[in-house]
């Protein structure tokens, strides 16, 4: 689960992390009071969407102006003008795709007098089962670009959760950022604060880009991106309360209600599969035969008829889907349950695109019988390769 920048900063501030003062704004008419409360003389007006690259992004609407999603204002009138332009407009960045995202919230923040910019992030290293720190003196830019062009400027080290963060980890961060004296001490303190917040809130990633040194000699978090481990959210109702469903894919929200593992993609062939490994293999073979999957969807091992029907409805709700491939290897999941769910869903929502079904495993004969006797126009497949070729051919009109 992701949250907005202003929410991430407020959360980090609870752990003592230094941030600039700011006020979230949801309506243009609230920007004046927010700017006056901060005082100025310089303000930063930031679009709040769940995507990076906001500063270099562009709004679709001409009425939003030709500046990006992060704007510097030097007067309260300019703050108000930016708020009117940006709220409700659609911001397109390198991470939103061409459709962009509507800006429903702004964060008006005190401007910072910046001397240096750094990059600092924490994430779960699944290979070592430790918390990894990623540090670079190249802040304020895309870290992927740094990794590609000058990888030697990125330094990583890990913290063992069994022992927790230690003073030497803070010194390692200070050294990586080439800080000394009081700034080194600030970096050491910040390292402990960030790690404590990361663990306490069960974060999956905490990215600060940039972490800045002000001309007054203070370390400050200028931008923060936080994502949480969804499996741990039950422990953190205060985090769940921060969820902004308008930033999420509507189909993914619906899937979560049925405990379905669904991820929307950009292709045209919808997939319903049981098991994450088989789902990925199904996506791979669709691509092998020249087309792209429209989604990742794992219905799990113990899905009911109702759950399968819900999954099918979610797939058909995607206007980009031009064909559907159901690929089930029944172990715990029974093929007849899948068949009943598919038939029920198709009869309710109709079938306007080709459907290929490959069933194998527990109750496979009964499952095939249910589908064949349903009267539906379903293409049966004998194996995964056969299924992929049939759905690709059907979608292409062959």
UniProtKB/Swiss-Prot annotation:
Q: What class of enzyme is it?
A: ligase
Q: Does the keyword Ligase apply?
A: yes
EC number(s) per entry: 6.2.1.5
Query: Is the keyword Repeat assigned to this protein?
Result: no
Against InterPro entries, the record matches this protein to: ATP-grasp, ATP-grasp_succ-CoA_synth-type, ATP_grasp_subdomain_1, SUCC_ACL_C, Succ_CoA_ligase-like_bsu, Succinyl-CoA_synth-like
Keyword tags: ATP-binding, Ligase, Magnesium, Metal-binding, Nucleotide-binding, Tricarboxylic acid cycle
Record's function text: Succinyl-CoA synthetase functions in the citric acid cycle (TCA), coupling the hydrolysis of succinyl-CoA to the synthesis of either ATP or GTP and thus represents the only step of substrate-level phosphorylation in the TCA. The beta subunit provides nucleotide specificity of the enzyme and binds the substrate succinate, while the binding sites for coenzyme A and phosphate are found in the alpha subunit.
Question: Looking at the UniProt record for this protein, which Gene Ontology cellular component terms does it annotate, in alphabetical order?
Answer: cytosol; succinate-CoA ligase complex
Family named by the database record: Belongs to the succinate/malate CoA ligase beta subunit family.
According to UniProt, this protein's pathway is: Carbohydrate metabolism; tricarboxylic acid cycle; succinate from succinyl-CoA (ligase route): step 1/1
Q: Which organism is it from?
A: Bradyrhizobium sp. (strain BTAi1 / ATCC BAA-1182)
What this protein needs as a cofactor is: Mg(2+)
Instruction: List residues binding Mg(2+).
Output: 209, 223
Outline the extent of the ATP-grasp domain. 9-254
Q: What protein name is recorded for this chain?
A: Succinate--CoA ligase [ADP-forming] subunit beta
Binding of substrate occurs at 274, 331-333
Q: Name one Pfam family in it.
A: ATP-grasp_2
Q: Which reaction does it catalyse?
A: succinate + ATP + CoA = succinyl-CoA + ADP + phosphate; GTP + succinate + CoA = succinyl-CoA + GDP + phosphate
GO MF annotations, alphabetized: ATP binding; magnesium ion binding; succinate-CoA ligase (ADP-forming) activity; succinate-CoA ligase (GDP-forming) activity
